[in-house]
UniProtKB/Swiss-Prot annotation:
Entry protein name: Protein sister of odd and bowel
Single GO BP term: blastoderm segmentation
Compositional bias of kind Low complexity: 183-202, 224-261
Lineage of producing organism: Eukaryota, Metazoa, Ecdysozoa, Arthropoda, Hexapoda
GO terms for cellular component: nucleus
């Protein structure tokens, strides 16, 4: 730097001596100025390497320089070169003496400017790589967040990451140290009667740098120029510095046009927020569409998947099974769950209606024995299916494990096992298990028949008796045997009659192993075992009379019976059935 300063001072002295060569005294001072220039040239040669290193250091510390006060070494060397070339034609000796110095100074300035531009290009390329990486991170985060549910924690984290990347981009592009967009100053001068040199006052650091889009083109041109010639490549900064130095005549006007480089603008925070909101809305729409599809699929499955029919002897089980993981969205969807409950209620109603029509459908069965058994099994299956659709039965009989939904029904049922009859008639003393049966019985003593038939006008003491009577007025009884076409006014009578066409005796006694066709026969037989154990067992080969009517149970034991015992047994059957 000191050598360049001496060189500038010597060049100025030589120019002054050349302009004043008319007087002998000033001509004598010219050799002294030439000697000063020679000494400065020697010092410049000695510090050639120092100038290159100082130029590279100047490139790293270029943001600390002031454009209006501290010119760089490259600009000073360029100015000295222009001054040495702009000497007047009257001083031929001065021009000849300073021309070698100007050429070497120009080479040094070009080298320094090239190094500065290369360093700036490398810095800009690194900054561009960081910017592109942040942009890629932001875009990938937004894309991944759009694929996730709107209210999930992962989507919120990805949106936050995208916002942080955007803010980092805004801070990075807002720094002048990373992206500089400066205008080259305009310098102009008008000179008359004197030789002047016009140069730009801006440093090489203030020249316009390439934008992000032009980085690839600059590097491509640099590689092509370096491979084609051995000369150092000239960048946009070097070309701009060379264009600012031009020799001028007595009347010259020079003007440098300012150039400005622009970068691709990044999206604003409003644009990013709108993109995030649009992605969240798209994710919410996709989730709602998937929920609607799951709801429709669940409704179809609920409509198609009916419970299999159970046999008459199969017990109902309410074991809980593992849920299928593929129906997670259906199980936690309130609308789909309510739809499933509605479908379940509809299926229960259909099963109940199906049970009432089974007796009519059983008439289509073919064969004598097979048709009867098939109709019975279908009736039992329908009853079991209807029972499966009903609510859980909480009250269980301790004798036969039969289930009931109400405690009163369980109490009445257990009285069939214990033969408890707490309601007795005060007129005849007959006892009943239920109070409504006693009320209907009292109409017999009063001769009152409040229940009249609308068809024939016949009166009945009990409402259930009238209901049974109305079936007789129908054109075709709904309870008809498919084997012998016999009609019955009660369904229970038809079921009992169907067993007479087969040899099936499904009811067996647990105490003695005897089998029966009807359940009522088995219950009556079981009562004989319970009551005989209470009075002391069998005496003289005959069971004790449980009803106190002198009846004998010899018919159950296979003993010969008379007419009196047969009549007593029929009376016992009527009493138990009540």
């Amino acid at each position: 730097m000191e050598a360049v300063k001496h060189l500038s001072a010597a060049a100025a002295a030589a120019a002054a001596a050349a302009t004043c060569s008319d007087s002998p005294a000033k001509a004598a001072a010219s050799p002294a100025a030439s000697s000063d220039i020679a000494e400065a040239l020697g010092e410049l040669k000695a510090s050639a390497t120092a100038a290159a290193s100082s130029a590279s250091k100047a490139a790293t510390s270029k943001h600390h320089s002031n454009n209006n006060h501290k010119p760089s070494a490259a600009a000073t060397a360029t100015a000295a070169h222009k001054k040495s070339e702009s000497c007047n034609s009257n001083g031929n000796k001065c021009t000849a003496a300073t021309s070698p110095i100007g050429s070497k100074t120009s080479n040094a300035a070009m080298a320094a400017a090239t190094a500065t531009a290369a360093a700036a290009t490398n810095d800009l390329a690194a900054a561009a790589a960081v910017v592109l990486s942040l942009q890629g991170t932001m875009v990938s985060s937004l894309q991944q967040a759009a694929l996730l549910p709107a209210n999930s924690a992962a989507a919120a984290a990805l949106n936050l990451q995208a916002l942080e990347s955007y803010l980092a981009l805004q801070r990075l592009t807002g720094k002048s140290d990373v992206f500089r967009f400066s205008n080259s100053n305009t310098g102009s001068s008008n000179s008359n009667n004197a030789t002047t040199c016009n140069s730009s006052s801006s440093e090489a650091d203030n020249n316009a740098l390439p934008s992000l889009i032009d980085i690839a083109n600059i590097e491509l041109k640099s590689s092509c120029s370096s491979s084609s010639s051995g000369e150092p490549p000239l960048t946009a900064a070097t070309a701009s510095a060379a264009a600012t130095s031009s020799p001028s005549s007595n009347n010259s006007n020079s003007t440098s046009t300012p150039t400005t480089s622009k970068c691709v603008p990044l999206p604003s925070i409003g644009t990013v927020s709108a993109a995030v909101a649009a992605a969240a809305a798209a994710a919410a729409a996709a989730a709602s569409q998937q929920a609607a599809l799951d709801c429709a699929t669940a409704a179809e499955l609920a409509a198609e998947c009916d419970l299999p029919l159970l046999d008459g002897e199969d017990a109902l089980s309410f074991e809980a099974g593992d849920l299928d993981s593929s129906y997670g969205s259906f199980m936690f969807n309130p609308s789909a769950f309510s739809q499933a409950e509605t479908d379940s209620a509809l299926h229960s109603l259909q099963a109940t209606m199906y049970q009432d029509k089974m007796s009519v459908i059983s008439g289509a069965a073919g064969g004598v024995g097979a048709g009867a058994v098939g109709g019975l099994e279908e009736a039992g299956s329908s009853a079991a299916a209807a029972a499966a659709q009903r609510s859980k039965k909480q009250f269980i009989c301790k004798f036969c494990n039969r289930q009931f939904t109400k405690s009163y029904n369980l109490l009445i049922h257990e009285r069939t096992h214990t033969d408890e009859r707490p309601y007795s008639c005060d007129i005849c003393g007959k006892a009943f298990r239920r109070q409504d049966h006693l009320r209907d019985h009292r109409y017999i003593h009063s001769k009152e028949k409040p229940f009249k038939c609308a068809e024939c006008g016949k009166g009945f003491c009990q409402s259930r008796t009238l209901a049974v009577h109305k079936i007789l007025h129908m054109e075709e009884s709904p309870h008809k045997c498919p084997v012998c076409n016999r009609s019955f006014n009660q369904r229970s009578n038809l079921k009992t009659h169907l067993l007479t066409h087969t040899d099936i005796k499904p009811y067996n006694c647990a105490s003695c192993g005897k089998v029966f066709r009807r359940n009522c026969d088995l219950r009556r037989h079981s009562l004989t075992h319970n009551l005989s154990a209470g009075v002391g067992g069998v005496v003289g080969g005959n069971l004790s009379d449980p009803f106190g009517s002198g009846s004998s149970s010899s018919s159950e034991l296979g003993l010969p019976t008379g007419s009196a015992s047969t009549a007593a047994s029929s009376r016992d059957l009527v009493a138990v059935s009540d």
